[in-house]
């Protein structure tokens, strides 16, 4: 997949460099990035980015390692403060309506808990001092497990699952918080072809049901079959040099 292919995918969408107001009027923006710079210490990974994420997008973020893709997701999720510029939440979107699935870590893979406990942990901090989860939380957890095809695994030990099953459980956990926007960071990394296809179909189904999806991926060709827009960080990373 080259830059020309990506440009064709975005032909009718707003440019990363100069968003066009006439095009944005046809869309409802969920968030707007204006002159956004993100990074760590003295190193800027995202520079002066102007970009809108619109309601209903399936936005695929591509780019080489170190180009700022994960940094951008962390900024949207509220886990990284901009060095300059702003990330504006629009159309009534709040942080607690954003679900975030980071790249899986060794600790996550070996966590000794049941699938149901893992998914319910998305609500920690939302049930105040009660020693149990509310019925609404349990109902939402079961709904998200059904959407990710993990409901039959509810009582299973998480660390005994296959890689694909674990990732679908973590997707269910992220989905519990994702009322309107779902952020996915390399959700199929390390999965076998069958598990990868299953994950993509689940994500596409969530998008078809109205979820706005922003996904970082290296699997560009496959992801673009479903993506409605593409943000190429190989291009953005050059900006400002």
What are these regions (language model features)?
Residues 157-161:
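Conserved ABC ATPase signature
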Residues 188-189:
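Short loop immediately C-terminal to the Walker-B catalytic DE motif
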Residues 182-185:
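Catalytic Walker B motif of ABC-type/P-loop ATPase nucleotide-binding domains
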Residues 85-98:
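Conserved ABC transporter NBD signature motif
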Residues 217-218:
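H-loop/switch region of ABC-family ATPase nucleotide-binding domains
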Residues 77:
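Helix-to-loop junction immediately C-terminal to a conserved catalytic motif
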Residues 135-153:
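Conserved ABC ATPase "signature" region
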């Amino acid at each position: 997949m080259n830059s020309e292919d990506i440009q064709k995918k975005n032909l009718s969408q707003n440019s990363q460099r100069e968003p066009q107001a006439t095009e944005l009027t046809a869309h409802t923006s969920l968030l707007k990035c204006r002159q956004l710079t993100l990074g760590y210490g003295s190193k800027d990974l995202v520079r002066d980015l102007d970009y809108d994420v619109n309601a209903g997008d399936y936005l695929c973020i591509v780019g080489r390692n170190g180009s700022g893709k994960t940094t951008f997701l962390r900024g949207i999720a509220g886990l990284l403060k901009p060095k300059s510029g702003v990330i504006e939440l629009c159309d009534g979107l709040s942080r607690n309506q954003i679900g975030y699935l980071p790249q899986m870590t060794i600790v996550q893979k070996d966590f000794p808990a049941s699938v149901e406990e893992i998914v319910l942990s998305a609500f920690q901090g939302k049930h105040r001092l009660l020693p149990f989860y509310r019925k609404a939380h349990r109902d939402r957890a079961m709904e998200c497990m059904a959407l990710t095809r993990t409901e039959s695994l509810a009582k299973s030990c998480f660390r005994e699952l296959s890689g694909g099953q674990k990732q679908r459980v973590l997707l269910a956990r992220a989905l519990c918080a994702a009322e309107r926007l779902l952020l996915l960071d390399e959700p199929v990394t390390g999965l076998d072809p069958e598990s990868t296809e299953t994950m993509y179909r689940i994500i596409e189904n969530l998008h078809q049901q109205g979820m706005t999806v922003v996904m970082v991926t290296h699997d560009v060709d496959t992801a673009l079959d479903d993506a409605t827009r593409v943000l190429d960080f190989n291009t953005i990373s050059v900006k400002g040099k």
